[in-house]
């Protein structure tokens, strides 16, 4: 992660299929000084239950891809590199990848809106079979959109890349 930020301290790209379209994508990899800054009033507000608040005060946004959701990491003494999906107002969900793996998968999707949901289904506790096909209706729609709007998107190539960059699961 540090090598990336030595070369490029964050980047922002957004796109829309056309002016009237809901088909869009966004990547907002925050500069490192923002990642490790204070996320009060965005990630947490200070009035939440103590255990949840203590945990979320360590959550640092890495990709602020939507106003209501992001991908980040927990900056703790354990130094676990795994990224997590956070839909504001709910809990975080592990994605099974570190920053380098996330960037590799991002390249397949061009930041298509909510592509991270594919990772949530791939990271599900039950091992997925290969070839993999999404089970959730929302993920099925996402794959259809990716195939239609992201040139050359291949679901099985994406899954193979995920398998290659996926962090080992703790025993």
Feature-to-residue mapping (PLM):
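Long, low-complexity acidic/proline-rich regions
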Residues: 78-81
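Charge-dense, low-complexity intrinsically disordered regions
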Residues: 116, 122-171
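Short amphipathic alpha-helix initiation/capping segments at coil-to-helix junctions
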Residues: 64, 76, 92-95
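Generic structural signal for hydrophobic core residues of well-folded globular domains
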Residues: 8, 65, 106-109, 122
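Short, solvent-exposed secondary-structure capping/transition elements
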Residues: 10-14, 114-119
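Short, surface-exposed beta-strand/loop micro-motifs that present aromatic residues
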Residues: 69-76
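A surface-exposed partner-binding patch
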Residues: 1-69, 158-171
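Compact, glycine/acidic-enriched structural inserts
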Residues: 83-117
